[in-house]
Each structure stands twice: as structure tokens, then as C-alpha cells.
Amino acid sequence: MGDQYIILFLTEKNGCTNGCASGTTIYASTQFSDRPGVHEDQEGFYVLEGEGYAKLDDLVFPIKKGDSFVALAGVAHTIRTKEGCEPVKVFWFHSAK
């Protein structure tokens, strides 16, 4: 995925039976992806490392280690690292079918 590195923790293949998934993603790029995530369910994020920006539809806001936020169902979302900062690493979780 280019400047994104994803590690999956839970999926339907290893324990989630209702369509849930969780993992970590490292966002090394300082640009927002032109292919944001969009899901039929909400997705929660917790920032583990780094500093950057999250974009939910047209809303852009700063994020840093210790922050958390939720992308509601159907909301396009993407993350980028702030220039000159450590890459943003997030833990994410979403569930439902």
C-alpha cells in the first residue's frame, strides 16, 4: 500500500465471527491518500505514535500520540503524518456486517 504498513490482529479468519477487524497501521506519507477508507460500520482509532492529521470527509484535524477518534459509517477517512515528525501509528477497530 505504498506508505502505509498494516498489521491485522483480528479478522473473520482468526476469531471474529461477526465481521469485526482490528490492527495497526503506520502512515509514513505526509500526503493524504487519494483512496480513503469508507466502511458500512464505524471505525475507531487510537494514536499510538507520531503526529499528523486525520481527514473525515472534508473535516481535517490534528492528531498526536494519545488521541482517539471515530469515523462514522459511510464517512471517508484517511490519515497523514505531519512533515518533519515521526510517522503516525494507529490502532484501529471496526465491527458489524
Per-region residue spans from a language model:
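A generic structural signal for short beta-strands and their flanking turns/coil linkers
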Residues: 18-23, 43, 50, 73, ...
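Short, conserved beta-strand element in jelly-roll/cupin
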Residues: 26-27, 37-54
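Histidine-centered metal-chelating micro-motifs
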Residues: 32-34, 53, 69, 73-79
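Short acidic-glycine-tyrosine-enriched beta hairpin
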Residues: 58-73
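Ligand-binding loop in jelly-roll beta-barrel domains
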Residues: 73-97
